[in-house]
Amino acid sequence: MTNIRKTHPLLKIINDSLVDLPVPSSVSSWWNFGSLLAACLAVQILTGLFLAMHYTSDTATAFNSVTHICRDVNYGWILRYLHANGASMFFICLYIHVGRGLYYGSYMYSETWNIGILLLFAVMATAFMGYVLPWGQMSFWGATVITNLLSAIPYIGTELVQWIWGGFSVDKATLTRFFAFHFLLPFIIAALVVVHLLFLHETGSSNPTGIPSDPDMVPFHPYHTIKDILGILMMLTMLSMLVLFSPDLLGDPDNYIPANPLNTPPHIKPEWYFLFAYAILRSIPNKLGGVLALVLSILILAVIPLLHTSKQRTMMFRPLSQCLFWLLAADLLTLTWIGGQPVEHPYIIIGQAASVLYFTIILLLMPLTSIMENHLLKW
């Protein structure tokens, strides 16, 4: 008798995705981050659901409702900090996942890659709206500054911003709609994840060598299930340590001050995972130019498959490209640092140099280096 997991219409889909899925035997731990992202999404949806039961999306009570969750709700404090720091873990895994895709040429699977870019935008939008909900000073002013960027769009900018605000400033209507979208988007993300996996399983995973691995496959279970469980346990350990020992390490102290439209904080800045994009935005003196650079800093991922000039898929055997990749990683860390600094000398010029370098590496240096490596291989 055939196993039910191979014949049942529903179980068959799960079986083909998580049990009998052929995986290249050479995939390393860099391939773990997909499952870690799924775990992060599950943690965020669960903690978010319970937080939503106690949160009120009204300007008069939002800040107090978060305080109430932390003080009066059973284990409310741990839910709140798991959710806040879970977002940080989410972005750490997300950036490593994208970095692995760049390093090992996973962008050659264009459908999977493009859905991934869409997912990145959706997660960033969700995180931004979530940051507004506690209605502290940084929530209010962050929402004001970032939504105001849309006013740089010619002709329709001002009307568009007021339409998003639901009034003439960030107020009750804005908070209510941000809560509605923040609740809805993770479920849309979950649906997109299924589509992401659907396209991935059409082609199968890539591997560190970049050569076809059809003759050398292993089943997903038990090899990669055990490997993924280990990764998830390690991530949950890190998250638990962050939540239990220093829950406010990655947050902004200004967000413990209730939102006040009459008092601007000295340094308005987003959460750490947006600082690199914020630094690129600030490095351009022109408003529209800054907004375009901000969007392009993420959207540039979409043109990377077109810029692939190497005869090899991955960077595993391309030392010059590896140097550029790690230079790009260092540049992003520099931008993250600059984004958290005040707008003054020498931070301005460092930010501008790092922003120019970011686009130069991706658009110019990487394709040219790949061409050079192709010629070196002829020797």
UniProtKB/Swiss-Prot annotation:
Residues recorded as binding heme b b566, renumbered to this chain, are 97, 196
**Key words of the record:** Electron transport, Heme, Iron, Membrane, Metal-binding, Mitochondrion, Mitochondrion inner membrane, Respiratory chain, Transmembrane, Transmembrane helix, Transport, Ubiquinone
Listed under GO biological process in this entry are:
mitochondrial electron transport, ubiquinol to cytochrome c
> Which GO molecular function annotations are given, in alphabetical order?
metal ion binding; ubiquinol-cytochrome-c reductase activity
Give the GO cellular component terms, alphabetically: mitochondrial inner membrane; respiratory chain complex III
- Name the coenzymes or cofactors required: heme b
Q: How is the cofactor bound?
A: Binds 2 heme b groups non-covalently.
Instruction: Give yes or no: UniProt keyword Zinc.
Output: no
* Cellular localisation: Mitochondrion inner membrane
Residues reported in the UniProt entry to bind a ubiquinone: 201
Provide the transmembrane region boundaries: 33-53, 77-98, 113-133, 178-198, 226-246, 288-308, 320-340, 347-367
Q: Where does heme b b562 bind?
A: 83, 182
- The domain of life is Eukaryota
Q: How does it sit in the membrane?
A: Multi-pass membrane protein
Q: Which InterPro entries match?
A: Cyt_b/b6_C (IPR005798), Cyt_b/b6_C_sf (IPR036150), Cyt_b/b6_N (IPR005797), Cytb/b6-like_sf (IPR027387), Cytochrome_b (IPR030689), Cytochrome_b_C_euk/bac (IPR048260), Cytochrome_b_N_euk/bac (IPR048259), Di-haem_cyt_TM (IPR016174)
Assembly description: The cytochrome bc1 complex contains 11 subunits: 3 respiratory subunits (MT-CYB, CYC1 and UQCRFS1), 2 core proteins (UQCRC1 and UQCRC2) and 6 low-molecular weight proteins (UQCRH/QCR6, UQCRB/QCR7, UQCRQ/QCR8, UQCR10/QCR9, UQCR11/QCR10 and a cleavage product of UQCRFS1). This cytochrome bc1 complex then forms a dimer.
Job of this protein: Component of the ubiquinol-cytochrome c reductase complex (complex III or cytochrome b-c1 complex) that is part of the mitochondrial respiratory chain. The b-c1 complex mediates electron transfer from ubiquinol to cytochrome c. Contributes to the generation of a proton gradient across the mitochondrial membrane that is then used for ATP synthesis.
PANTHER family hit by this protein = CYTOCHROME B
What more the UniProt record tells us is: Heme 1 (or BL or b562) is low-potential and absorbs at about 562 nm, and heme 2 (or BH or b566) is high-potential and absorbs at about 566 nm.
UniProt record similarity statement:
Belongs to the cytochrome b family.
Protein's name according to its UniProt entry:
Cytochrome b
Gene source species:
Pteronotus macleayii (MacLeay's mustached bat)
